[in-house]
Amino acid sequence: MKFALTGGGTGGHLSIAKALAIELEKQGIEAIYLGSTYGQDKEWFENSPLFSERYFFNTQGVVNKSFFKKIRSLFLQAKAAFKAKEILKKHQITHTISVGGFSAGPASFASLLNKIPLYIHEQNAIKGSLNRYLSPKAKAVFSSYAFKDKGNHVLTSYPVQNAFFDHARTRTEIKHILFLGGSQGAKAINEFALLNAPKLTKQGIKITHICGPNSYEQVRFFYQELGLLDKIELFAFHNNITEVMHRADLCVSRAGASSVWELCANGLPTIFIPYPFASNNHQYYNVLEFEKENLCYVVPQNELLPKKLFEVIRKLNQKDDQGNKNLTTISAKLQQKIAKDGAKTIIETILSA
């Protein structure tokens, strides 16, 4: 028995691949990885001991491209698919798991050509174009969101690494705010943090700001100009995000699916600012259910005024009829919304098929 994991491009897809690879390793099952030279795949897995072999193809996405660039991307995808077909055959792969993203294309189609069972994890509430096409052909489609289109859909807990559960706690007061710009940085969140920093620090609220490597120097300069650089924690990125989340009492974040469910597992109340240009507005739909259940606050990017933060803080500090702060109630309910061992459930479901 030997698995192939494929897909990625961004941290959200890759974090799922990592969680599944860790579970395969725990169960003593060998796995290889197939991704792309474009995006973050190599950064995550080029030297990863989780895989016996790693392959990266020269491929790019097709969505939001001009006609001629789409043709070129499709050609690269097809070329890589035939290479992937030989690789899967060489390694005698018995199962393929796609975590989505354009880099999943070659190995997914190669699996179908080789008649290898294909399993998909759809991380978002709105399917990407590749997963929409492949879902009816897959053995199973795992997701934490309910879908009604064609395909054998299996509702599972999101495959969040156990460290997020292990560092969870129920919040009781807001002493520390985390601004999470994501691996690629988020200009709107970075500006929101800078605009609110003077008032927050004056009120004695600690700030941790992860701004993304491309924005670090500029953001650092502005904190220095504000005279706040020595009063806040600023990082381009952080290798121990679970510890950072553990210390925070409130978070401001984009609404990529992995971030949403990691924050949920940690019990960290969050203000989500969905990326408005995400395909099919999927970031908004990722948190729609949370918003309906009063488990988060969603602020459209075009409404992101500094006063919004303090409006949310006031609401979180209000008490319900039982005398519990909204902050504490939300924090506790978040931890109940997601079950541990999502990756284990997915792997065991595949093995029992």
UniProtKB/Swiss-Prot annotation:
Its EC number is 2.4.1.227. Pfam families: Glyco_tran_28_C, Glyco_transf_28. It catalyses: di-trans,octa-cis-undecaprenyl diphospho-N-acetyl-alpha-D-muramoyl-L-alanyl-D-glutamyl-meso-2,6-diaminopimeloyl-D-alanyl-D-alanine + UDP-N-acetyl-alpha-D-glucosamine = di-trans,octa-cis-undecaprenyl diphospho-[N-acetyl-alpha-D-glucosaminyl-(1->4)]-N-acetyl-alpha-D-muramoyl-L-alanyl-D-glutamyl-meso-2,6-diaminopimeloyl-D-alanyl-D-alanine + UDP + H(+). GO terms for cellular component: plasma membrane. InterPro entries: GlcNAc_MurG, Glyco_trans_28_C, GlycoTrans_28_N. Its main location: membrane. Gene3D superfamilies: Glycogen Phosphorylase B (3.40.50.2000). It is found in: Cell inner membrane. Pathway: Cell wall biogenesis; peptidoglycan biosynthesis. Keywords: Cell cycle, Cell division, Cell inner membrane, Cell membrane, Cell shape, Cell wall biogenesis/degradation, Glycosyltransferase, Membrane, Peptidoglycan synthesis, Transferase. UDP-N-acetyl-alpha-D-glucosamine binds at residues 10-12, 124, 183, 283. It is a peripheral membrane protein. One of its GO terms (biological process) is cell wall organization. GO terms for molecular function: UDP-N-acetyl-D-glucosamine:N-acetylmuramoyl-L-alanyl-D-glutamyl-meso-2,6-diaminopimelyl-D-alanyl-D-alanine-diphosphoundecaprenol 4-beta-N-acetylglucosaminlytransferase activity; undecaprenyldiphospho-muramoylpentapeptide beta-N-acetylglucosaminyltransferase activity. Cell wall formation. Catalyzes the transfer of a GlcNAc subunit on undecaprenyl-pyrophosphoryl-MurNAc-pentapeptide (lipid intermediate I) to form undecaprenyl-pyrophosphoryl-MurNAc-(pentapeptide)GlcNAc (lipid intermediate II). NCBIfam families: murG (TIGR01133). HAMAP family: MurG. Belongs to the glycosyltransferase 28 family. MurG subfamily. This is UDP-N-acetylglucosamine--N-acetylmuramyl-(pentapeptide) pyrophosphoryl-undecaprenol N-acetylglucosamine transferase. It comes from Helicobacter pylori (strain J99 / ATCC 700824).
